[in-house]
Amino acid sequence: LAIPLPDVVTAELFAAIVQGEINGDAGYQKWADNETDEEVVRLLRLNGREETIHAGRAQKVFELLSAS
């Protein structure tokens, strides 16, 4: 699946990417809250935590690029 990407990623767009990762965690947690299968719940919560980890890495990239 080809997804068109912008030629330039602005600071504003990058901040939105970080926020999207954080929101992704909340979405997975809410989804998990509504499931009854323990393995499904575990996997959804794990995916959510990974979204927060992604957000932290993306934030670090933003900080490094902003410092230069």
Predicted regions and their residues:
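Non-heme di-metal
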Residues: 1-68
